[in-house]
Amino acid sequence: MKNVTDSFVSLVHWPSAGSFGFNTDILATNPINLSVVLGVLIFFGKGVLSDLLDNRKQRILNTIRNSEELREGAIEQLEKARARLQDVQIEAEGYRAYGYFGIDEQRHESINSTYKTLEQLENNKNESIHFEQQRAINQVRQQIFQQALQGALGTLNSCLNNELHLRTISANIGLFGSMKELTD
């Protein structure tokens, strides 16, 4: 341990001529170097510090503005809440003056109105279901009719050949000829 301490002490007291060592004497350091370093720090640091302070000032001002706006909004909401409270208190006084009979009557009216509304909704639902069923039935009928018609046309087209077609035309001409003779 003593060797480590001795080596550190000898390093501190190392002769300054031609060698490197720690200079613990602050008065012996070069004042010009210190003043240059401090001058550079002050010159460049002043701008950075000024920008930091300006940014901080703007953030504080914005925070204050936002706080003022929030405070005004809160005051406005508080006034609305107070007005609503007064309205509710007046309404409550009216209910107290009207008595429980009026409240019970209003409750029955509300229940009856709700039942009527539900009944109307049920009727509307049933009508909608019936309408949709009829529409679906009509669509199915149309599709069946179209398929039957297409099937009949397909069958006729596949069964008719030129010879059968000519015989049918000749038979119809003969039928029309005999009908003409009867009418004359």
UniProtKB/Swiss-Prot annotation:
Belongs to the ATPase B chain family. Keywords: ATP synthesis, ATP-binding, CF(0), Chloroplast, Hydrogen ion transport, Ion transport, Membrane, Nucleotide-binding, Plastid, Thylakoid, Transmembrane, Transmembrane helix, Transport. In plastids the F-type ATPase is also known as CF(1)CF(0). It is found in: Plastid, Chloroplast thylakoid membrane. This is ATP synthase subunit b, chloroplastic. One of its GO terms (cellular component) is proton-transporting ATP synthase complex. CDD domains: ATP-synt_Fo_b. The chain crosses the membrane at residues 27-49. One of its GO terms (molecular function) is ATP binding. F-type ATPases have 2 components, F(1) - the catalytic core - and F(0) - the membrane proton channel. F(1) has five subunits: alpha(3), beta(3), gamma(1), delta(1), epsilon(1). F(0) has four main subunits: a(1), b(1), b'(1) and c(10-14). The alpha and beta chains form an alternating ring which encloses part of the gamma chain. F(1) is attached to F(0) by a central stalk formed by the gamma and epsilon chains, while a peripheral stalk is formed by the delta, b and b' chains. It comes from Oenothera elata subsp. hookeri. The lineage of its organism: Eukaryota, Viridiplantae, Streptophyta, Embryophyta, Tracheophyta. F(1)F(0) ATP synthase produces ATP from ADP in the presence of a proton or sodium gradient. F-type ATPases consist of two structural domains, F(1) containing the extramembraneous catalytic core and F(0) containing the membrane proton channel, linked together by a central stalk and a peripheral stalk. During catalysis, ATP synthesis in the catalytic domain of F(1) is coupled via a rotary mechanism of the central stalk subunits to proton translocation. It is a single-pass membrane protein.
